[in-house]
Amino acid sequence: VNKKVAGIIHAPVSDVASNYTKLIQSGVPFVCVERNILGSGIDSVEFRDREAIFKGADYLLASGHKNVLFFRESTDSTTRDERTKGFLNALEKYNINTNDANIVDVTLEKGEDDCMLAIQKALRRYRPTAVLAGGNRITLYLMKTLRDMGIDCPGEISVVGFGDESWSELTYPPLTILRRDVKGLSAKAVGMLFEKINTGVAISHDCYADVELVVRKSTKMLDNGPFGDKAAAPDSVGLTKEEETQTKGRTLQGCDLFPLYRNVLGRIA
């Protein structure tokens, strides 16, 4: 490491400390981003990966999907472990046995064709109603696989992707995505690095950047109603002109609402 370098922002490809011995021993201040180096005491700024995947899985499960397939990277890392825990935590919330969790590893190092083949096999084996992707490239390969298989999204399979790629809102349909706050992560990492350069230690304690669930058009709700009726988006439910006339200017009680509910239900079922 060049001693003239004031500081380094480092994105580790591994979380094993022995892979970075020279960097650690150099004395040059550095901060890790996205992944930490285990057992080293090195400062890092990471995304809330467990919380992120929980959000995605929770959204699908709350929409009535019980057969949710989770694709994750096959690498042995804390990031993969945290995302897996988030998925399992969501299943537990809905009283789904985690032993029955549909989790498939995708080995990105094998290349696009092999990854898409693995995804295709998993889709045919598990026949999910919804899929959650655990990484940027997995999301891309998943969408390509669905296209090649002629699977309608979200008609046949709902999809929640992962990442910050601009193409996610340009796909058809626009992709519901777990969007990482990359700018927030970068700002925190730079701030922490300057603290270390100026004082020798990192003063900041907020070492995480958020991940937001951005809901678009690649997911749909399944049957959730009390009578086995289909769930519907609010903007697809409306009263007829006759019903509007009947209810105009009236304070409705429960006995008035129930017939209206059944009428509307019959139109969207």
Predicted segments with their positions:
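Short acidic capping loops at alpha-helix termini that bridge into adjacent secondary structure
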Residues: 66-68, 98-102, 152-159
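An alpha-beta-alpha
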Residues: 54-94, 201, 205-220
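Alpha-helical recognition/docking segments in bacterial nutrient-uptake
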Residues: 1-58, 62, 120-125, 245-249, ...
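Short beta-strand elements in bilobed, periplasmic/extracellular small-molecule ligand-binding domains
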Residues: 88-112
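Helix N-cap/beta->alpha junction signal
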Residues: 12, 49, 80, 135-136
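Intrinsically disordered or compositionally simple regulatory linkers and C-terminal tails
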Residues: 222-247, 254
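Hydrophobic alpha-helical segments within soluble ligand-binding/sensing domains
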Residues: 41-70, 85, 89, 111-120, ...
